[in-house]
Curated annotation (Swiss-Prot):
GO terms for biological process: regulation of DNA-templated transcription. Coiled coil: none annotated. Keywords: Cytoplasm, DNA-binding, Transcription, Transcription regulation. Belongs to the TACO1 family. NCBIfam families: PRK00110.1, PRK12378.1, YebC/PmpR family DNA-binding transcriptional regulator. Disulfide bonds: none annotated. This is Probable transcriptional regulatory protein Bind_0345. It is found in: Cytoplasm. GO terms for molecular function: DNA binding. SUPFAM superfamilies: YebC-like. Its main location: cytoplasm. Pfam families: TACO1_YebC_N, Transcrip_reg. GO terms for cellular component: cytosol.
Amino acid sequence: MAGHSQFKNIMHKKGKQDAIRSKLFSKLAREITVAAKLGLPDPAMNARLRAAVLAARAENMPKDNIERAIKKASAADGENYDEVRYEGYAPGGVALIVEALTDNRNRTAGEVRSYFTKSGGSLAETGAVSFMFDHVGLIEFPASVASEEAMLEAAIEAGAEDVQSNEETHEIITSLESLRDVAQALETKFGEPRKASLIWKAQNAIAVDDEAGEKILRLVNLLEENDDVQNVYANFEVSDTLLAKLGD
């Protein structure tokens, strides 16, 4: 997952703080509401809603919050959110894709642009960097559900494209079209996954030094803290030393 997994782990550690966890729940609820509004309000019949609910459960979001977010989709006075994708460059020529759900495109665009500018990067046109990424499905299981060999065999048999396993997680990559079928096949065998959603996977990762890496991670942090930003993807790698420093 290149830079995506690296800074995702840092954000997870920082997410223990109550204020950040509250913001995370708000973002998860927004995605649940949007997913329910775009399709049926039943996770079993709505793949995007199911993915949103899985993500919420993985963060221990209370069941009541999840159900309230689903019901909000049918409320007459509910907010309407637009899905927006921003693309740009961070220091060192690193490419970033930012996905947002916003009720004010001008506000969000202005804020995202300011983050890039303050961090020494630049916001670009849509399509400027997405060709450096593959839009694919990602399924995650805890490492404890199966051995690396068993997961690899089951995933490939189900139609997955790649499997990456470590001490904590099995990450299964699928095509856009096969995500749902592969997820269902693996769930039958190993139980409910921790995640099953679409991501932007970098085709290649750029190795950056600690100075540039710190600037990039600062930009990612600014983006992640924005209420409208849902996901951030990048194509960089930093040293374990910097990760340990920022993860403390």
